[in-house]
Amino acid sequence: MKNKTEYYDQFISKIPNFPKKGVLFYDITSVLLKPEVYSSLINEVYSFYNFKKIDCIAVVESRGYLIGAPLSLKMQLPLVLIRKEGKLPREVFSEEYELEYGFGRIEVHKDDVRTYSNILLIDDILATGGTLKSSAILLERAGGKVKDIFCFIELCAINGRQSLESYEVNSLVRYN
């Protein structure tokens, strides 16, 4: 996927010391304030994945939803939600994950994933790779197979891609 850092960087807000001191938070919600930029993002991802063999899109709560939901509609594919612990009403698989700034737990409905063999997993940012790795493990434990991973932003210096080396990982914006 072509690196589009120069273009999108101007629309991404950077908030120092959030959610805790020493962390620089990359806020993609500012992209949503510019419909033409948001549309461009969705179209870029669509153009890259439209001709790949994808049968489902899985998204990580919550900012992954902002990319995955419109993309699933555009590609006419099912959308599977990966949520934080305690937010899903049916029986779930769960997995602990490590963040750049702590730990958490994610869940997916047991019966949402079982037949998909070419899942595109989407999140807004790749930092440590902990959330995405745990999400991939979760989807595979539920019977699916992750084919590709897409993140809008990749923090290359943290080297989260290394923990995802068994997957094809793509990003549009790469910060060193």
Swiss-Prot record:
UniProtKB keywords:
Cytoplasm, Glycosyltransferase, Purine salvage, Transferase
The highest taxon in the source lineage is: Bacteria
Q: Which Gene3D superfamilies match?
A: 3.40.50.2020
Alphabetized InterPro entries for the sequence: Ade_phspho_trans (IPR005764), PRibTrfase_dom (IPR000836), PRTase-like (IPR029057), UPRTase/APRTase (IPR050054)
Q: One GO MF term, please?
A: AMP binding
| Enzyme class of the recorded protein, top EC level | transferase
Q: Where in the cell is it found?
A: Cytoplasm
The pathway it acts in is:
Purine metabolism; AMP biosynthesis via salvage pathway; AMP from adenine: step 1/1
Q: Which residues form the signal peptide?
A: none
Q: What is its main location?
A: cytoplasm
Its Enzyme Commission number(s) read 2.4.2.7
What CDD domains does the record tag this protein with?
PRTases_typeI
Q: Which Pfam families match?
A: Pribosyltran
Q: Catalytic activity, per the record?
A: AMP + diphosphate = 5-phospho-alpha-D-ribose 1-diphosphate + adenine
Subunit annotation = Homodimer.
Which PANTHER family does the record cross-reference, listed alphabetically?
A: ADENINE PHOSPHORIBOSYLTRANSFERASE
The name under which this protein is listed is: Adenine phosphoribosyltransferase
- Organism lineage string: Bacteria, Pseudomonadati, Spirochaetota, Spirochaetia, Spirochaetales
Gene behind the chain: apt
